[in-house]
UniProtKB/Swiss-Prot annotation:
It is an enzyme of class 3 (hydrolase). InterPro entries: AB_hydrolase_1, AB_hydrolase_fold, MES/HNL. Keywords: Hydrolase. The keyword Hydrolase applies. Pfam families: Abhydrolase_6. It comes from Arabidopsis thaliana. This is Putative methylesterase 6.
């Protein structure tokens, strides 16, 4: 029998990670009776694209855009949940498929506005972090010399100290074997044209603040919220940059609350 209360979630991972990031949350949402798709962006997870093949933000987000394009009117609207750099991917998707999205949930994610270039919020944070704080994270230029792009690989020490400090140690050990080189969403990758008011700007947004994030620190998350106010702000205490590992039950509970409130399929 069809579950009339079933919601459809689309989960977007952050830089260097993959769909596997969401395994704990995905399982809990499915047990609650919902349909969940966690997407591997290009050159992420099991997606076979090479990072050097990614020349634009559209290239990087191609798997997400193709999935949303495949949804028909019978599928109902989806709740897009974006983590970290995935917030910029979610905004791009909303610009093309606003009519298919009930809401975007930014889980300690970069939340672009509709005035500045897509990479504005990321590059603002980047300027505020001293180079030495990236520890063993590497960053490499690729592409054309006169139009350089960049990819990164998060270092084990950086992940342990800045990203997973409240998460189970055994989870981090697995993560170290799964992260891949990913493009950084710079102005050269994303372009300088802002996301549109009629597309991305028309979609309901909810921001979940992670109080103990040491990458996108709470003050910075609050700045993004004031820069482009969402419909609602929630928070998770004691959550690090990876709340799907440090606080999966709390993440799931908030997503279910959001789905019931904002998705009326």
């Amino acid at each position: 029998m069809e579950n009339k209360n079933q919601k459809r979630f689309v989960l977007i991972h952050g830089v260097c990670h993959g769909a596997w990031t969401w395994d704990k949350v995905k399982t809990q949402l499915e047990v609650a009776g919902h349909c969940v798709t966690a997407v591997d962006l290009a050159a992420s997870g099991i997606n076979m694209t090479k990072v050097e093949e990614i020349q634009t933000l559209n290239d990087y987000c191609k798997p997400l855009l193709e999935f949303l394009s495949s949804l028909g009117s019978d599928d109902g609207k989806v709740i897009v949940v974006a983590h970290s750099m995935g917030g910029i991917s979610a905004a791009l998707a909303a610009d093309s498929f606003a009519c298919k999205i009930a809401a975007i949930v930014f889980l300690t994610a970069f939340m672009p506005d509709t005035i500045n270039p897509p990479a504005y919020v990321y590059e603002k944070l980047l300027r505020s972090i001293p180079q030495e704080e990236w520890l063993d994270t590497t960053c490499v230029n690729y592409g054309k010399p006169d139009f350089p792009l960049q990819y990164t690989l998060l270092g084990p020490k950086f992940m342990a100290k800045k990203m997973y400090q409240n998460s189970p140690v055994q989870d981090l050990e697995v993560v170290k074997t799964l992260v891949r080189e990913n493009p950084l969403v710079t102005n050269n990758l994303a372009g300088t044209r802002s996301f549109s008011e009629e597309g991305y700007g028309s979609v309901t947004r909810i921001y979940i603040v992670c109080r103990e994030d040491l990458v996108e620190v709470e003050d910075y998350q609050r700045w993004m919220i004031s820069n482009f106010p969402p419909k609602e702000v929630m928070e998770i205490k004691c959550a690090d940059h990876m709340p799907m590992f440090s606080k999966p039950q709390e993440v799931c509970a908030l997503l279910l609350e959001i789905a019931n409130k904002y998705c009326k399929n």
